[in-house]
Amino acid sequence: MHPPAYDLPEELALPLASGAPYWYWLGGRPALDFVNTRRERWRRQVETLVTGADLGRWLVQAGVASPPAPRVPRDLLDEARELREAIDAAVTAILEDRPAPRGAVVLIDHWLDHAAPRPHLALTDGGVPVLGERAPAAAAQRALGAIALDAATMLGSERERARIRICASDTCSARFYDRSPAGRRRWCSMTACGNVAKARRHRARQA
């Protein structure tokens, strides 16, 4: 079970030494939870995938990698962040009724190569063609491929694109997938941002 969401304290020392205490799981699907590892996009741009160890732990908690946490070298951490921002660029373009950036789509498509075993045609010593599978990518790459596949599934479907949202709070930048029957959900969490907004409206009426 994922830990609850945490509000970021105003006095939070940045950059973080580790982002693990500040992950939240309100996106409704792995691709959007991944985008949300960059917190407060409107304000402080808080990076919560600070180290390779952070990313390895996050992939396990997100359910796209099995424990133990996969090893993530620095260059792969950088590539993972690039994938995250590509997904977000496509998401925000859709929400703003703009064409999705070609570069973002190409990058997501690149990661799909790691999402599942790929067929490989080889020759035996006797020259007979044999169909097999290519060597699997490392665990962290496979997990990032799974995130890319989730993003591609969401972005590539008109029905699913219509369910992508950004929290209506002025201070929250969480992206989420609206699974409500009416499709009118406004908040990443009613118990968090929704209640805060409700309390503000109440205070305004009392003033």
Task: Annotate each language-model stretch with its function.
Residues M1-I166, S173:
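Short helix-coil boundary/hinge micro-motifs
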Residues A143-A207:
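BZIP DNA-binding basic region
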